[in-house]
């Protein structure tokens, strides 16, 4: 019985995270269609292996430098490999006063929801 409950909890957690993931990707695409700046925060090597059309590569380690040139009210969609680094960039940019930023998650997640 205990393992059945654990399995049920695991299934719910996996399903819930998938729903959230697709929602954030869908929101990302909606913003992109409205003209948001698309920023890939992965490394240059990862970016060269594939990226979204019209994306610019501002690696997470360089976010503080690159975003000094961008209006803080500019709509921005961030993504990376899994959503972790773009989440870190989101938190940093929010703390810097950026008002229209969105963490769209990972590249594959975005591609699957296009």
Residue ranges and their predicted role:
Residues 2-7, 18-36, 45-74, 84-114:
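Rhodanese-like catalytic fold shared by cysteine-dependent sulfurtransferases
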């Amino acid at each position: 019985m205990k393992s059945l409950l654990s399995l049920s909890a695991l299934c719910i957690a996996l399903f819930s995270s998938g729903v959230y993931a697709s929602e954030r990707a869908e929101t990302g695409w909606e913003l992109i269609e409205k003209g948001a700046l698309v920023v890939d925060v992965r490394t240059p090597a990862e970016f060269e292996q594939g990226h979204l059309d019209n994306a610019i590569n501002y690696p997470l380690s360089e976010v503080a430098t690159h975003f000094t040139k961008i209006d803080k009210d500019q709509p921005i969609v961030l993504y990376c490999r899994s959503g972790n680094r773009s989440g870190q960039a989101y938190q940093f940019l929010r703390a810097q006063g950026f008002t229209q930023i969105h963490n769209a998650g990972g590249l594959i997640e975005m591609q699957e929801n296009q």
